[in-house]
Amino acid sequence: MAYKLSLSAVEPLLIFPAAPFSTKKEKSTFQNNLISSDVFSSALKPLSPLKSLVADFSTHSNPSKDNQLISPPKINHREFLNEEKESDTQTRYLKQLINICNSPSKNHETSLSPSKSTIDNNERKLDNEIDNYKHDVKYSPYKGQGKTSNPSQGTTKCPGIFEEDNFFSVSPKRRKNLFEKYGKTDLGKPARVPSPKKSLSSTIKSPPSRVKLPTSILSKSPPLKVPNKNRSSTFSPLRTPTSSSKTFVIVDHSTPSPPSIRTKLEAFAPNSTFATQKRLRRLATLESSPALRSTLKSLQSKSSPVKLLKLKEEKAKIKNQLFKSEEEKDPVGKQKLPLESSLSPLDHSSAEKEMQKAPAKNKRRRTGSLETGLYPKESPTPSKKRSKRVLWSLKHIVSPGNREKHSLNSTPESIMKKDTKWPQNLAKNNINSEPNTPTKSNIDTGKAHSARAHKTRKNIQS
């Protein structure tokens, strides 16, 4: 027995309503209406042969499971709106189906084959709602500032949300904490959560406070209070302030605390324990890196005593080879100089002559000690550029000082003679003799002589 089935008769039964039910009541009423309606019972009769075929197929594949029908896929209202790939014809047809599913009537004929006028009306209603939702959204960030947003500027995929929104002015760290949900940022949520009584989940679910939506689309939850513009971000419930300008925190210095907890007024005094902890932490992070581990291993292997000895031996061999090659190149280098200890002071001149003959390289390498020895090198002809060494060599030419000229008996010219008053007895008897230490008697006589002289001067003046 053949059945003729139209698409309009079958498809409403395979598609569930697109918009999710907000409450359990709505869901149950919708199901009851479907079951009780004539559409549900009458449509199953012609579908009976198809159903049996599906059942046979399911039992053949899985014999343990009894007759099972695959549940039809749910269409999400938002996803359906956001999909841009769908053609206009498809969307219109789906809109009709959603309309029919959401408003089931008891009349079999009207629900399955609605008239053109009803379809057109439903289409217009849906189109108007979507257009209003997308374009005619009023944007008001704060009270008293009523802005109407331009639909051409910054409309996103999510309808009713604009890039001008305050979401973009929030710091990225807070944005991540507040708005990241299932790996995607929900645009349009308020920048600050206003009331601390509400939980975070309820505030995220509620619609944005600054976007005015049509009443048909808005949920029953009350709109959020807009936070005051002048209030700082530290007063938000998510960021509980550790310290404010009015309160003073008493910090216990016995335990080390990071500088972020310390108050502004408190002087920063670094703790030694805190510093060591930081250092240890830094070391741990360094040691964990694989590159540093490899370098440490190589250093440890190098620093072993056996390897160090080997390295020293290799260096010595290389030096000897270089020395031999240099000697072969220049014949002057072969003339070996006698050691410094074996040389007498007279032999130094001959050694110096040999040094002058030898090239600069050998001089530096072999006999560096002779160059800076006891006897400084005296150049026979002083160069134009006068160095310290040249001046030192010419020291013997410089005339000796005044002290060396005079004999030991004569007094030097540089020392000034003191004007001393000698007693008369000494002055008369020994004119040339100068006592080293004057006796007490001499001092007394000197005093008396000076007193007499003073009196005579006074008498003369009078």
UniProtKB/Swiss-Prot annotation:
Residues 449-462 have a biased composition (Basic residues). Residues 104-120, 146-156, 229-240, 422-444 have a biased composition (Polar residues). It is found in: Nucleus, Nucleolus; Cytoplasm, Cytoskeleton, Spindle; Chromosome, Centromere, Kinetochore. One of its GO terms (biological process) is centromere clustering. Phosphorylated by cdk1 at prometaphase arrest. Phosphorylation prevents nsk1 kinetochore and spindle targeting. Dephosphorylated by clp1 at anaphase onset controls its relocalization. It comes from the Eukaryota. GO terms for molecular function: microtubule plus-end binding. The keyword Nucleus applies. Keywords: Centromere, Chromosome, Cytoplasm, Cytoskeleton, Kinetochore, Nucleus. Residues 104-161, 180-240, 320-462 are annotated as: Disordered. Residues 121-138, 180-189, 324-333 have a biased composition (Basic and acidic residues). Ensures chromosome alignment and accurate chromosome segregation during mitosis. Promotes proper kinetochore-microtubule (k-MT) interactions during anaphase B. The phosphorylation status of nsk1 affects the proper k-MT coupling, ensuring that it interacts stably only at the correct time during mitosis. This is Kinetochore protein nsk1.
